[in-house]
Design a protein with these regions (language model features):
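Canonical tetratricopeptide repeat
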Residues: 86, 120, 124, 158, ...
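N-terminal leader/linker segments that initiate helical-solenoid repeat arrays
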Residues: 28-86, 90-102, 272-274
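Structural signature of tandem alpha-helical TPR/SEL1-like repeats
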Residues: 63-66, 95-102, 132-141, 166-178, ...
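Residue-level recognition of tetratricopeptide repeat
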Residues: 56-57, 89, 127, 161, ...
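Helix-start (N-cap) detector for alpha-helical repeat units in TPR-like alpha-solenoids
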Residues: 49, 81-82, 115, 119, ...
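Terminal, low-structured helical/coil segments at or just beyond the last alpha-helical repeat
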Residues: 38-39, 44, 239-274
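Structural marker of alpha-solenoid helical repeat scaffolds
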Residues: 76-77, 110-114, 148, 182, ...
């Protein structure tokens, strides 16, 4: 996928496409605590080890510098894969995305954990590569994750994120279709696909996806924001304003609310100059 370009391509997508794609990496799923695998000795974690892992992840998120030092010390004392994963999480929290992604790649390569856990490592590595502006490596790791766990709908979404950021909207839609085939009731995925359809100027298909997302989640602010974009394109500024005002009312202070405010201001400037 050497045709991937940097994040500058996202400047062409002023909507909510892929805004939510990085959330899960901040949540840093407790891979080992959830799966019960990953120990270097017997393939499982004791209750004490699980608690240590959870505490390490929490510190890595809340106080990443302290978390990094703690994770390194745990690793050096024989903490194994869970400690190595915690080191990477701390690096992500510190904004050192390339180093985190490199460590996650190495961890996935060395891991003796079950395929679902390794796929999770690769998915997180892919997200870190995206944040490091390396979409080619992100796509590579996400593809590897899908080879291990092809029936996980979130992994298809993850790869669609990289494809969308690269401006490969048709390929992104293909991956989103596969995710929806596995789980049709994903409002967020319908919204992502609607944004991709909008970028391809397939506005009717985009509106269908947005309306279906709102059937599932009537107050979804991302869906309302996207519908506002579609109304604006159709020249229905009053309806666009209504949706964006709802976004601001229901999620004030969030990035999507800030984007809605900016869109209203731009629309008012254009209207005033006509």
């Amino acid at each position: 996928m050497s045709h991937f370009r940097g994040l500058s391509t996202l400047s062409r997508a002023t909507g909510t496409l892929f805004l939510a794609g990085f959330v899960s990496i901040w949540a840093a799923p407790n891979l080992y605590a959830q799966s019960g695998s990953g120990s270097d000795t017997n393939g499982t974690l004791s209750l004490e080890e699980k608690q240590q892992y959870q505490d390490c992840i929490k510190l890595a998120q809340l106080k990443p510098e302290d978390g990094f030092e703690s994770a390194i010390a745990w690793r050096d004392m024989g903490g194994g894969e869970p400690a190595r994963h915690c080191v990477a999480v701390a690096l992500i929290s510190l904004g050192k995305y390339e180093e985190a992604a490199t460590r996650l790649d190495a961890l996935a390569k060395d891991s003796t954990a079950d395929p679902g856990v390794v796929a999770g490592m690769l998915a997180q590595a892919g997200q870190a590569w995206m944040m490091a502006n390396n979409l080619e490596f992100a796509w590579r790791d996400q593809s590897r994750a899908l080879e291990l766990v092809p029936n996980n709908p979130q992994l298809w979404v993850d790869r669609a994120m990289a494809l969308g950021l690269a401006g490969q909207y048709w390929d992104a839609i293909d991956d989103l279709n596969k995710s929806l085939d596995l789980d049709p009731n994903q409002a967020d995925v319908l919204i992502y696909r609607a944004s991709a359809w909008r970028m391809l100027e397939s506005y009717d298909l985009a509106m269908t996806d947005v309306e279906n997302a709102l059937v599932i989640e009537p107050n979804n602010v991302q869906a309302l924001f996207e519908r506002g974009k579609l109304y604006q394109i159709a020249g229905k500024n009053d309806l666009a304003r209504r949706d964006w005002l709802n976004v601001i009312e229901n999620s004030n202070g969030t990035p999507v609310a800030d984007a809605a405010k900016a869109n209203i201001e731009k629309m008012d400037v254009r209207t005033g100059s006509d």
